[in-house]
Amino acid sequence: MSDCETERQRIRQERWRDVILDRIGRDPWVTVYYSERTEFETVCFFSALIPNVKVPEVLGSSSWDLTIGEGVPGTITFYSGGEAETKYYRFGKDDGIEPLIIYRDFHGVMPSYVEISEEFRLFHNLFHDSKSNRYLGMDENGDSEEIALLDGESVKIKLNQIRSFLSRKEMHLAVFFDIREASRHTLEELGVQETSEQSRQDNLACELCIRKGDLEPGVQTISRLVGKKLIAGPPVQETGGFFSEKNQEFASFVIGVDQAGNEVAHTCNPKELANYFGANPTAPHCLTPVFFRREVLTKYYANPKRFSVEDGYLRCRGVWGLRMDNNHAKYVVVFLGDLGADLSYKEQLYWRSYNIRPEGGISAVCFRRSFLGEFADADRTDLVFKSVLSTFNRDWSAVYGWPLFKPLSDADSHCLVALHIPLTEDEAEFDSQVLALAKILIESLNEGKLRDAVPELDPNTKGISKLERFLQVKGLTDCQAHIKFMRNLHDLRHGAGHRKGEAFQRAAAEFGLGDKNAGAVFDAILRKAVDLLRYLNCRLLGVGSAEPAQT
């Protein structure tokens, strides 16, 4: 393509017309503000919210209905019968048109910038990530999503979020454009004529003007494309916001087998399940247990800042929560109705990928809690350890005035939150849990207070030895098994974080690491940790029994 042909297309604004006609309102992102100026091109986009009732009037002209800098609070003074009346308007005038983008100008004293309407940000509860200058929304699953991007002289917003906002406000979005092109070529050289073309469509009003350029040196031809394109919101019932109910999908889960041995599945939609109030009597009950491989919890343990796997409950911050039976010896079990009531469809599909045929019943702990209405302590070792540790720390501090195990820092808090019996035979998972437990029990020992409690202690004595000496001073002569456990855990932890040497091999042999699977080994380690805490509880605090946990 020749330079002259390229210039002809540019002056006729063919590329920009294609963008306006084919992409605005169809692309997933809408440019609601943009400003750029080069030697031969000036491009400006802006936007405003137009009441639905004003759409015919607005489309009657290609001029902008709100200019950059307008849409801020102001007053208008009216005169009637010689009397002046001043009224305040939130957006500066009384025509019902509102800004989506507000241009903040400080007359050169401070840098100007643009911001998105506060109402829009609050409507979608957007979080401003100041580092990347973007706004994030959160879906029903707790996943974050980019909603708006601000980059210098450009603002883009997700189309679907704009449209749901428009639907609720009963407004249209007007995307204004003003694009000016200049060329050194004459009209004759370009093969174009002076023109003023107006275009009107159901959602578009624009005008293209081409004429001689006689105002700037070296510019022979100029063109200007100015106008607006309107974007409507969907019908209110399709938005799923506020008071309308979304058409939520529900996954089906395996709940049993038929006489031929084939799997039987059923939807988890609570409205299609039986309950104790007589609903759907021929359907499976909402309390039908659904079984899952324990690996279903992997992604939740892997992100402790967002998820918390608790005794009988899975929590995604304050977004959602799911009751579950994680005290089961082999599986995770969830009631069918809870899957539909508490999980989004996206999360249901994740759980379904770990769904297996039922095998036996729910745990005794879950049965007592769910059907007998009784308080029941956890019996799965990782859950027991967390409960016992919490109680021990509280009781020890009440007696001695200081914690034996110092609280983990915010940066290390995940060690306790995500502590669990390994779900797989992956060595890295086992090592990470050993590291976490060692950080909780060994690296968190309150060495300063232990040293203060034993004044004659050798200054070179380290953590576990300090605890050993403290216990001896307290008259405990039967603590060697627990001290040995802590030393073995220390050696195992050293091998998990460094090259695995002789000390690690001895500790691994002590814990039976070569003879049993990783889950069984770490379960046994946690039992010894629970025994240690109960021993200290009984001998130094006078609480409970020091009898070892049953294996």
Where are these regions (language model features)?
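Short alpha-helical linear motifs
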Residues: 507-512, 533-534
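Histidine-centered, metal-coordinating catalytic motifs and their short helical/loop contexts
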Residues: 480-509
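Amphipathic alpha-helical interface elements
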Residues: 1-323, 337-484, 488, 521, ...
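Amphipathic, charged alpha-helical scaffolds that flank and support histidine-based chemistry
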Residues: 514-522
